């Protein structure tokens, strides 16, 4: 079994891998280059092991994740500035690849051929919620501590890892637009009403509820990858 610094992967007799995100030395999990490297390897591990039926990803901390590490974004922009002085076209390509890395990783997960379920035990923001949306199943703990959001708009940026594509394919258009343009926090009850999560579970039964989704035959295919998929709110028309 591979070893990871930021994740613990355990596969029980049920054939379901439990991926626990628990970054050492941090009070909250965040996406860094290293975290993305490791998650990429875990997706390969789950997909390539015939003994693994699917995976549940959760957090080993009181919160799920705050999203992307802002210092990582600063490094991207710093590297862009350095490369731009040497070769502007190369710098643009590099920035595009770096910015799109998380999007590609989440798409890889949702098309890996194995079902993934996100077990959201606490605050789940930005890129972390986009990761959850890429999972085939989503379960949130029934707790006031659980808040889900795409809050990037509050700091002048827009969700860049698939949230703007997946939310409108799950929720009706009006609710999706309100969420994406306001950065509002969603409680488990509100998120379920918007069809952004599938189940709400007692905190102590969160992981078991997530595993049950896989045992009960959760398909490793997103609704929008099914033939004949239609937006939940119907076609969007303009005047």
Over which residues does each language-model region extend?
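Glycine- (often His-adjacent) and acidic-residue-rich active-site loop
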Residues: 59-104, 154-156
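Glycine-rich beta-to-alpha active-site loop
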Residues: 103-155, 179
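A glycine- and small-aliphatic-rich helix-loop capping segment at beta-alpha/alpha-beta transitions
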Residues: 71-80, 130, 135-142, 170
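Intrinsically disordered, low-complexity segments enriched in small/flexible residues
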Residues: 4, 16-18, 33-36, 42-43, ...
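Conserved CoA-thioester-binding segment of acyl-CoA-metabolizing enzymes
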Residues: 1-58, 82
């Amino acid at each position: 079994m591979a070893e990871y610094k930021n994740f613990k992967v355990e596969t029980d007799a049920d054939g379901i891998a439990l991926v626990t995100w628990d970054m050492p030395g941090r009070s909250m999990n965040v996406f860094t280059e290293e975290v993305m490297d490791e998650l990429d390897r875990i997706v390969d591990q789950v997909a390539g092991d015939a003994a693994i039926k699917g995976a549940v990803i959760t957090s080993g901390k009181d919160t799920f994740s705050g999203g992307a590490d802002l210092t990582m974004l600063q490094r991207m922009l710093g590297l862009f500035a350095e490369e731009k002085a040497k070769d502007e076209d190369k710098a643009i390509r590099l920035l595009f690849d770096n910015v799109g890395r998380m999007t590609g990783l989440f798409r890889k997960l949702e098309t890996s051929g194995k079902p993934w379920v996100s077990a959201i035990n606490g605050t789940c923001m930005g890129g972390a919620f986009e990761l959850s949306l890429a999972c085939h199943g989503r379960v949130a703990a029934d707790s006031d501590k659980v808040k889900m959001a795409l809050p990037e708009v509050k700091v002048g940026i827009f969700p860049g890892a698939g949230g703007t594509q997946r939310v409108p394919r799950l929720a009706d258009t009006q609710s999706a637009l309100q969420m994406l343009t306001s950065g509002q926090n969603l409680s488990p009850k509100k998120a379920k009403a918007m069809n952004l999560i599938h189940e709400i579970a007692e905190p102590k039964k969160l992981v078991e509820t997530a595993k049950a989704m896989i045992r009960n035959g959760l398909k490793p295919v997103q609704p929008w990858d099914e033939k004949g998929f239609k937006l939940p709110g119907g076609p969007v028309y303009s005047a």
